[in-house]
């Protein structure tokens, strides 16, 4: 009950000023001969919001000021509160209100007669029209509030000069006489600038913003394909944009022929995680040969622009080919001081150049390019070895061996391998003979095996420089190249370099097809050429070509497996960028890596690399490191428990949250 009494007294106190105001107005109107003022309770039209008349200074009732203001009353039925316009002349004729005439307000006694007050405040039609004309009217054709419209700082818009408002259009206001020229110069192709004044259409499929002509702000040289789009085509292109795959996404092998057996998606073998062991071993051996250096030797430090010489010959006291009357030859690995690449330097010991024109033949051989050909780079004479020597520079093929060495070790060659070697050598001979040259080096000591099923013809151009002064017939040497190729096939088929001593007996060990090929190559028919022999071996070419394609697919598969092998390195680099480093803020530099998300990253670092077993010994499990970092890179929802080193803090967090913490910390550092 006491609460109700307090509430009634409080409400009476709040209403007392309003009742006093109404009583004073009633007393004022009863003594004034002028018509009553307009009141919002009885007016039939409402002044628009925002069109307010400046309010005169407030004066307290009972003062002797000549102007009295009629306070409007709040009407809940009106859409907005609008102050009424007071006729100053009507108030001046009556003078200020007499506060003594107002009856005293007694709460709870006499009720207020609202109908009587409403009748007294009834406005005449003429006075209402005058009051309405004194207010500014809202014109729909006039733009709204325009800041800075006048130089004086007034925020009132200039109604007379304001441009008319037109929906979905943009009006250009000319500030000077040159504005038209400026507007013309800014016109451009559609789609250059965005026009936000597009009306919303309910039920439309999608919102497509309009584009307005304007200059394209693009850096010079940038290929902006948006220039060809218009009317929302840019938004359509953005919706169809495809983003690149994440680094942790691996695509499975798409060739079913390469699978040894059918496995389920979750079943893996050891070969699925590692490089092919044979390819791995071969590549490592090549790297060792490239990086091998000579500890101590009597070789010169520099030979022309080449340095770091390493002897590659296995037999130092014998000539390489064993032919009588020829100068000894030595082969070195060297490095070019200009381009930093490895080359093979073939030295002809004791050679004296008698004709400078002999070096011109090197240019012809430099133009020969073939996958079964060891390119000749340059030739020069030198005395850096202590004598007159001819140096021939060829491409260096690491881990390459000659057929002569392989045959001496008892290497067996299958029929398919022999046919593959035959086709490769016929192809390179066809290229050489078409250039008007002869190889003169189709010999087991000059043919290199540089990979599975790959051979290369080496030392080409060597005898053109040595025997330059001799009158030689190129056609005869081309026929000799084909005959030597037949003898080479015979040696490979018999697995011995001694097979050429008794050709007739060695041919009996070959099958009919190979026997026919060798007999044709060894024949004295001068019309035979490398291209004709290749044409006759077209049926054999299919199998070799298919094998080369399968090898290419296998190498591409191995390359794809190693495509993103640097993901974990990048991830570990990010972790070390964040942990135990000062922060970007000088005030929080010491605590930056120990607070917030960075503390989780530090605990995760200990979880990956600093684990211990139950005996307190360090655990160095590479599988745990790789598995955990892969999960972090993928950002999966799996949760792990992170425990501080003192064991007082224990946090459960997912790999997804940890990945977000790392990205957030890196953004702070940037």
UniProtKB/Swiss-Prot annotation:
Lineage, highest ranks first: Eukaryota, Fungi, Dikarya, Ascomycota, Saccharomycotina
Coiled-coil residues are: 539-577
Gene3D superfamilies tied to this protein = 1.10.287.3700, 1.20.5.5160, Transferase(Phosphotransferase) domain 1
| The protein's role, per its UniProt record | Regulatory subunit of the poly(A)-nuclease (PAN) deadenylation complex, one of two cytoplasmic mRNA deadenylases involved in mRNA turnover. PAN specifically shortens poly(A) tails of RNA and the activity is stimulated by poly(A)-binding protein PAB1. PAN deadenylation is followed by rapid degradation of the shortened mRNA tails by the CCR4-NOT complex. Deadenylated mRNAs are then degraded by two alternative mechanisms, namely exosome-mediated 3'-5' exonucleolytic degradation, or deadenylation-dependent mRNA decaping and subsequent 5'-3' exonucleolytic degradation by XRN1.
One GO CC term of this entry? PAN complex
| Protein location | Cytoplasm
Q: Which stretches does UniProt call biased (Polar residues)?
A: 149-167
| Knob domain: annotated segments | 578-670
Subunit structure as annotated in this protein's UniProt entry: Homodimer. Forms a heterotrimer with a catalytic subunit PAN2 to form the poly(A)-nuclease (PAN) deadenylation complex. Interacts (via PAM-2 motif) with poly(A)-binding protein PAB1 (via PABC domain), conferring substrate specificity of the enzyme complex.
Q: Name one GO biological process term.
A: nuclear-transcribed mRNA poly(A) tail shortening
Instruction: Quote the HAMAP family the UniProt record gives.
Output: PAN3
Q: Which intervals of the chain are annotated as region Disordered?
A: 123-224
This protein is called PAN2-PAN3 deadenylation complex subunit PAN3
Family matches, as SUPFAM superfamilies: Protein kinase-like (PK-like)
Keyword Coiled coil attached? yes
